[in-house]
From Swiss-Prot:
UniProt KW Transcription keyword: yes
Subunit and interaction comment: The RNAP catalytic core consists of 2 alpha, 1 beta, 1 beta' and 1 omega subunit. When a sigma factor is associated with the core the holoenzyme is formed, which can initiate transcription.
Family: Belongs to the RNA polymerase beta chain family.
Signal peptide per UniProt: none
Species this protein is from: Nitratidesulfovibrio vulgaris (strain DSM 19637 / Miyazaki F) (Desulfovibrio vulgaris)
Designated name of the protein: DNA-directed RNA polymerase subunit beta
Function in brief: DNA-dependent RNA polymerase catalyzes the transcription of DNA into RNA using the four ribonucleoside triphosphates as substrates.
PANTHER family in alphabetical order: DNA-DIRECTED RNA POLYMERASE I SUBUNIT 2 (PTHR20856)
Reaction catalysis annotation: RNA(n) + a ribonucleoside 5'-triphosphate = RNA(n+1) + diphosphate
GO molecular function: DNA binding; DNA-directed RNA polymerase activity; ribonucleoside binding
CDD domains per UniProt: RNA_pol_B_RPB2
Swiss-Prot/TrEMBL keywords: DNA-directed RNA polymerase, Nucleotidyltransferase, Transcription, Transferase
Length: 1372
């Protein structure tokens, strides 16, 4: 029976949280397209193959075409790959076709001569586990999703920062998925330049000409024409065009045909007057005679008599030009409209600057700029230009890029068109010109509409394409070198380039990361992480403040809280709880649709661009009885701003208050009362919590604990309705009823992990929560994982906390904790260390793993078996031998004495040295597992044979359990068919002569309980029943055979030996479980960023205690709360205390055997929830008692973020629990028994132990390794280094006058080589005097000065007395 839980949330949850690993798993499934009847040809692996094939040779005499691919079964399962250090991968085979052509020399036509089709092994492909991870070389890795600038077009300006004039310069950039970038930008003179691939800039009109446009075409496209008439008397008239409104002042009165004056001379033309002028039908308006000066011609002006070009298009109309035109009798001039509100002459000015004449010249110029080294010809230049943006082989916008281009430029091109068209470029320039001339706003590059997620599938797809392109080059070369007609496809294809690229990506890429496996939460958050770093992304050094900052478009998509502290802040972020990534890679968040102030029940997922302009209400907006928005004005978000909008305008509404934060932040109760900085620390530190030996879920939770634990993959969850057939600590067997696993008869066996080492060395183990015979439904928890209780995350412990100072032991966030937590193993965790030893074949002979080690006493070998490997269960401490190993030594020159002994006692024993694997310092624990790996052809030692026998026995037991479970399930199915049916013959029992039923008897369940299934064949009178029974038995036999084959394959893998690296004879891995109890120096934290280090573990009797004698568990500093502003911890403390006390009171009522009716009423009063009332009423007495008994530890409460318990509710709970409303109480000093002066805030807080454990960090050194150059001790625990003495420490010692101590530190204990030797000699002789020499670092300095050309010599002055000798032991 589940635990009774009090939920404080008031907003109904109408939409479930999507599976937390969907992004990873779905992306890779889409990439593989495995098992699909018809694969999509433009995406995933299929799309990659189709984009590279067909491959033709240079003469077009042969073509290698791709047909299909097939992914096989992996050779080893996931557990075997982790154990043996292998990659979890599957073989991939491709079917290709080689077509050979005959080419006609004259016509160039091709005819098919030969076709060869072949299946080819194409290497392996790493597979994703169901948990969203990859197993590479035996370790679990995660491919982090990359957050990258989206392909498409973006318009920007420099905000006046580029040029000294502070002029705002506009630019635009077209970014493809693959191919050349195209940049257009203005300089301070308003000339428009283009850059291709960020090379040297050139006037943009060169690009237009290269596209085939003439000078006139360019002007006609970008400018409107206006016409001016010049009368014989020199007056100038402007022809009225309705769509060309002039704001100028009138030169003369503008009047209609009837004499009505619309605008008086000298007055500006208004829009109203312009409308009247157009309606009156005026054809021309007189303008000033000098109006034409400085304008530009729209067309070439030709002398009608002679055909001579008097002025060219784009020429400026100067008085001289006007004179020439007047002489030729031309009275109507076409002029470029450059004086409008939002038009300028910038493109015309660019055209004048451009000296290229035509298309050919422009293409040659572009070729010269991009390929300055090679001389161009028109043909090469044209081909090169066409390949830049128009060829699908070299340029790919991708559907995303085309979608963004269409969206921004208002085009309606097909998403299949993935190259740039002339229309795209011209429209982009038109939009850019309009933006510049109207001083419009630039696009926001940090808006999530302009950033997209590249999930794992796309990242691997890109790597696969790189590998295939490399292979393509090799294939083309091979085709040209050899006679293709004699070749088969497998002669041409070599998959090694693809394998190398994949290996590099999964092994060393910045986005392929060692999985953070500290606990279930850290696994899930790592898979939901988005990184702006990585190839093609940003770098820490270049990323500015803007890209790291929280943006309004992040709402509901990216968590504003969870990000690392330090240099990566804001660059690595997390998806929010409800966020999804759509097919284009944009992050979407769900909303309820609101129509006519009513919620429609429809939910839409929108990306940041599509959300623009919607009026979005918060999830807590109240509704009235009719289901309409209750308030006249509602708090809404519109285009990122928070407004009060009329309820009629609301179009969407948030689905949940927790949709704006990530899962880590959603696990913090009362998040709304915490400062964001502390919430960031809180969400990060929960990921560092070590799973404890005894899990306990928080009394004050948020409701996110269940989804996180269940989606993490750490639990085992029922996949459908069924019955548990078998359950123990090692495995659970379930028979499912809904057609799952038909080949196994619906029976699935789950192996539970026991003492499994995680990536962070924490101990992962699963424990069953079900029992045999239990009926389960889909989603039920069958087994809990590490740090999980009842399918809910349980990373810490509920402790009774007091906020008070205690003798300075909680100064600066230090933590005082009760010794009871150590005695009861409250914060004890198990960590597993792996040690490996390898026996190699050396030049001097093979190394050997053996118990026979020279010069080692029997007491050191007592735990080793005959093979020299430690026994399981041995308790080991530092310097104990785990695996005995000897290595041959080189022959040494013998002394005469040794030669004499050799002559007397015969040949010496082999000259070997002891290279045994020993326990390193700081490790003390129990050996829990040993693995021995032998070469396939190698001899197995006794220990290897024992391990093999054990593994085979375990597999046999598993197979029998599995078949037994299948038999039980089949028996149930048979009973449904035969129950009540009559048997035709006597049914005999197992014992000789035993009769279970006579012929004609009706079958019952008891009758068939012990009868072997085979005996039921042909037993019944009814022929149809016999046929049904035979069909079931036949199916059972096939399923048994299927299961047997699986286990036979596993047995073969156990016995066949291992693939070891070259030169390795044998490898042994030893696993030691280390129990780490809580100790002084361990780091602990709450969920609100309240971290600290344990400063003192105090006996329980000395801890402050309540009036009834119960001591508190932990004492925290009250000064840690006000300045940090994380008040959530205080609210959690109060609510936790009330929950614990009320639970205790209810459990005491149960123990006192109070009447159940009174107890039921008390439970209802405590929970105060209609849902709990009906649940309590529906329970029988036994279930009710069990549920109340669980409340003894406290009532589990759920207070969701932004929708949690209000202060009034917490106060009312405190009052119900008979606690003072202010949450303070009187405490007594455990040492004196006296009451503390002030009442103290006490309660229950959930505390975590973090993986920064003092036992893993502390170490001590007497002597150890030294640096070669400086001769100073190395640093760090891994190098067994010394303690660094910095200048501040030197000052402190100087201040104390500890001169000899300081001299010792700076010389013999550091880098005085001769002084070290002398000191050792003196200690041995008992002559304890310090004689310091010259530090080696001084010699290094001298050598450095010499390297700079300075001659440095040392002189000792005569007559100087040496200092008096002082004993260095006395100086201490």
């Amino acid at each position: 029976m589940g635990q009774l839980t009090k939920k404080f949330g008031k907003i109904p949850v109408s939409l479930g949280i999507p599976h937390l690993l969907n992004l990873q798993v779905d992306s890779y499934v889409k990439f593989l397209q495995e098992g699909l009847a018809e694969r999509k040809t433009d995406e995933g692996l299929e799309g990659v193959f189709r984009s590279v094939f067909p491959i033709e040779d240079f003469n077009r005499t042969a073509s290698l075409e791709y047909v299909s691919y097939d992914i096989g079964e992996p050779k080893f399962d996931q557990a075997e790959c982790i154990s043996k250090g292998l990659t979890y991968e599957a073989p991939i085979r491709i079917k290709v076709r080689l077509v050979v052509y005959d080419v006609d020399d004259d016509s160039g036509n091709r005819t098919i001569r030969d076709i060869k089709e072949q299946d080819i092994y194409f290497g392996t492909l790493p597979l994703m586990t169901e948990k969203g991870t990859f197993i590479i070389n035996g370790t679990e890795r995660v491919i982090v999703n990359q957050l990258q600038r989206s392909p498409g077009i973006i318009f920007e300006h420099d905000s006046g920062k580029t040029h000294s004039s502070r002029k705002v310069l506009y630019s635009c950039r077209v970014i493809p998925m693959r191919g050349s970038w195209l940049d257009f930008d203005f300089d301070h003179k308003d000339i428009l330049y283009v850059r291709i691939d960020r090379r040297r800039k050139m006037p943009a009109t060169i690009l237009f000409k290269a596209m085939g446009m003439t000078k006139t075409d360019i002007l006609d496209y970008f400018y409107k024409k206006e016409f001016y008439r010049i009368s014989a008397d020199g007056r100038v008239f402007w022809e009225v065009q309705k769509d060309m409104f002039r704001k100028d002042s009138a030169f003369a009165d503008i009047a209609g045909p009837d004499g009505t004056v619309f605008v008086k001379a000298g007055k500006p033309i208004t829009k109203r007057a312009w409308r009247q002028i157009c309606e009156a039908g005026l054809e021309t308006i007189e303008v000033a005679a000098d109006t034409l000066d400085g304008l530009f011609l729209a067309d070439d002006v030709v002398n009608p008599a002679t055909g001579e070009v008097l002025a060219e298009a784009a020429d400026e109309v100067t008085p001289g030009v006007q004179e020439r035109l007047r002489e030729a009798g031309i009275d109507r001039l076409p002029i470029l409209h450059t004086k409008g509100i939002d038009t300028s002459s910038s493109l015309r000015d660019t055209l004048v600057l451009d000296k290229t004449a035509d298309k050919e010249a422009a293409q040659v110029e572009i070729y010269r700029r991009l390929r300055p080294s090679s001389p161009p010809t028109p043909e090469i230049a044209e081909s090169f230009f066409d390949n830049l943006f128009r060829s699908a082989d070299y340029y790919d916008l991708s559907p995303v890029g085309r979608y963004k281009l269409n969206q921004r430029l208002g085009l309606d091109q097909s998403l299949e068109l993935r190259v740039l068209t002339d229309e795209d470029i011209l429209t982009a320039i038109r939009v850019l010109l309009h933006l510049k001339d109207s001083h419009g706003p630039a696009d926001d590059i940090d808006h999530l509409g302009n950033r997209r997620v590249r999930p794992v599938g796309e990242l691997v797809e890109n790597q696969y394409r790189i590998g295939l392109v490399r292979m393509e080059r090799a294939i083309k070369e091979r085709m040209s070198l050899q006679e293709v007609s004699t070749l088969m496809p497998h002669d041409l294809i070599n998959p090694k380039p693809v394998a190398a690229v994949l290996k590099e990506f999964f092994g060393t890429s910045q986005l392929s990361q060692f999985m953070d496996q500290t606990n279930a939460l850290s696994e899930v958050t790592h898979k939901r992480r988005l990184s702006a770093l990585g190839p093609g992304g940003l770098t820490r050094e270049r990323a500015g403040f803007e890209v790291r900052d929280v943006h309004t478009s992040h709402y509901g998509r990216i968590c504003p809280i969870e990000t690392p502290e330090g240099p990566n802040i804001g660059l690595i972020v997390s998806l929010t709880t409800y966020a999804k990534v759509n097919d284009y890679g944009f992050i979407e968040t769900p909303y309820h649709v609101i129509r006519d102030t009513k919620m429609t029940g429809e939910v839409v997922y929108l990306d940041a661009s599509r959300e623009h302009g919607e009026v979005i209400a918060q999830a807590n907006a109240p509704f009235d009885a009719e289901g309409k928005l209750a308030d006249e004005y509602v708090t809404t978000r519109v285009k990122g701003d928070v407004l009060m909008s009329p309820r009629e305008e609301v179009t969407l509404m948030d689905v949940s208050p927790s949709q704006m934060v990530s899962i880590s932040a959603a696990l913090i109760p009362f998040l709304e009362h915490d400062d964001a900085n502390r919430a960031l620390m809180g969400s990060n530190m929960q990921r560092q919590a070590v799973p404890l030996l005894q899990c306990e879920k928080p009394l004050v939770g948020t409701g996110m604990e269940g989804p996180v634990a269940q989606d993490s993959g750490a639990c085992i969850i029922a996949e459908g309705p069924g019955i548990v057939r078998y359950a123990d600590a090692d495995r659970i067997i379930v028979s499912y009823e809904n057609g799952l696993y038909p080949e196994r008869g619906g029976v699935r066996a789950y192996d539970l992990q026991k003492f499994h080492k995680s990536n962070q060395n924490s101990c992962f183990g699963q424990k069953p929560t079900c029992h045999p015979g239990q009926i389960v439904a889909k989603g039920d928890i069958l087994a809990d994982g590490p740090g999980i209780e009842d399918g809910e995350l349980a990373l810490g412990k509920n402790l009774v906390v007091a906020f008070m100072p205690w003798c300075g032991y909680n100064f600066e966030d230090s933590i005082l904790i009760s010794e009871r937590t150590v005695k009861e193993d409250t914060f004890t965790s198990v960590h597993i260390e792996e040690f490996e030893v390898v026996a190699r074949d050396t030049k001097l002979g093979p190394e050997e793993i053996t118990r026979d080690i020279p010069n080692v006493g029997e007491d050191m070998l007592r735990n080793l078996d005959g093979s020299g490997i430690i026994r399981i269960g041995a308790n080991v401490k530092p310097d104990d031998i785990l695996v005995g190993k000897i290595t041959p030594k080189g022959e040494t020159q013998l002394t005469p004495e040794e030669k004499l002994l050799r002559a007397i006692f015969g040949d010496k024993a082999r000259d070997v040295k002891n290279t045994s694997l020993k326990v390193p310092p700081g490790i003390e624990g129990t050996v829990i597992e040993v693995k021995v790996f032998n070469r396939r052809s190698g001899e197995k030692d006794e220990r290897a044979r024992l391990i093999e026998e054990y593994e085979l026995g375990r597999l046999d037991r598993k197979e029998q359990d599995h078949i037994r479970g299948l038999g039980d399930a089949t028996r149930v199915k048979l009973m449904a068919v035969v129950e009540g049916k009559q048997i035709a013959t006597t049914l005999a029992g197992k014992k000789k002569g035993e009769v279970i039923a006579e012929a004609g008897a009706s079958v019952t369940a008891e009758m068939l309980a012990d009868v072997p299934l085979k005996k039921l064949s042909g037993l019944f009178k009814n022929r149809e029943v016999n046929e049904a029974v035979d069909a079931l038995l036949e199916s059972y036999d096939q399923q048994v055979q299927f299961i047997s084959n699986i286990y036979e394959s596993k047995r073969g893998k156990v016995t066949e030996g291992d693939d070891l690296p070259p030169g390795v004879i044998k490898m042994v891995k030893v696993y030691i479980a280390v129990k780490r109890k809580l100790s002084v120096g361990d780091k602990m934290a709450g969920r609100h960023g309240n971290k600290g280090v344990v400063s003192c573990i105090l006996p329980a009797e000395d801890m402050p205690f309540f009036a009834d004698g119960r001591p508190v568990d932990i004492v925290l500093n009250p000064l840690g709360v006000p300045s940090r502003m994380n008040i959530g911890q205080i609210m959690e403390t109060h609510l936790g205390w009330a929950a614990k006390e009320m639970g205790r009171q209810l459990a005491e009522m149960l123990e006192r055997n109070d009447p159940l009716k009174a107890l039921r009423n008390e439970v209802k009063r405590a929970f105060d929830s209609p849902a709990i009332d009906s649940l309590v009423d529906s329970m029988d007495d036994e279930d009710f008692r069990a549920s109340v008994a669980k409340l003894g530890r406290g009532i589990v409460t759920k207070t969701p973020v932004f929708d949690g318990a209000a202060e009034e509710e917490i106060w009312s709970w405190l009052v119900r629990a008979n606690i003072d409303e202010d949450g303070k109480t009187v405490l007594y000093d455990g040492r004196t028994g006296e009451r503390f002066h002030n009442r103290v805030t006490t309660g229950v807080m959930y505390m975590l132990k973090l993986h920064h454990l003092v036992d893993e960090k502390i170490h001590a050194r007497s002597t150890g390794p030294y640096s070669l150059v400086t001769q100073q001790p190395l640093g760090g625990k891994a190098q067994f280094g010394g303690q660094r003495l910095g200048e501040m420490e030197v000052w402190a010692l100087e201040a104390y006058g500890a001169a000899y101590l300081l001299q010792e530190f700076l010389t013999v204990k550091s880098d005085d080589v001769t002084g070290r030797v002398k000191m050792y000699e003196k200690i041995v002789k008992g002559d304890n005097f310090l004689e310091a020499g010259l530090p080696e670092s001084f010699n290094v300095l001298v050598k450095e000065l010499m390297s700079l050309g300075l001659d440095v010599t040392l002189h000792q002055e005569e007559g100087k007395k040496r200092p008096k000798r002082v004993g260095f032991m006395n100086a201490l």
